[in-house]
Amino acid sequence: MLRIPHLNLSIILKESVMIKEVSQKQVPSYLRARRSKLSRYLARTALRILGWEVSGNIPDEEIIVVVAAPHTSNWDFIIGMLTILALNVNLKWVGKSSIFKPGFKWLFKWLGGIPVDRNNPSSLMEDVKDIVAREKGFIIGMAPEGSRKKVIRWKTGFLRIAELTQAKILFFAIDAPSKCILIGDIFKPTGNVEEDLKFVKNYFSAFKGINPDQF
């Protein structure tokens, strides 16, 4: 039986305001990307103008699967990409192949995007194997809801990837009321998909998305 942690959200959010500037210091050196200082500066500036902060640090783990939720708005993608740039983290993220259109494909791939064909999801596993084999540190991010709309059943691909790579799962919570991206707890899956999925969903139930009625 998994124990669901009790989150004292008031303490978490009180601590989050202590971080005024997003920095690559929140990321272990071997998990950082090779992006320019200008791109990082522009991303930090954009987050500051929008009023968003990033609290917490990415742990010193060689392989990490990031789970981001609640996903209820198109703004989640924009804020997420700005966060990746501002942290200068070498994070790969999974997106449906239809968004990788000409004109955007190069940008999304530069930002770490991996297109996945929903009719052939097994191809993602091959991509992950290739990346893990050639890179020292590997982080892949996914939104298990798979949609901005309210869904009952979350997708379990993140658990399969964690099992394939023997990775731990790191929670990225999007909390709209506080305008904070919280880099939260790290979780080692048990191998019981239903119990693990229940644990993850309960963790994120403490947070509210931009459109809370869709979560």
Model-predicted segments: where are they?
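Residues at structural and domain junctions
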Residues: 3, 28-32, 66, 94, ...
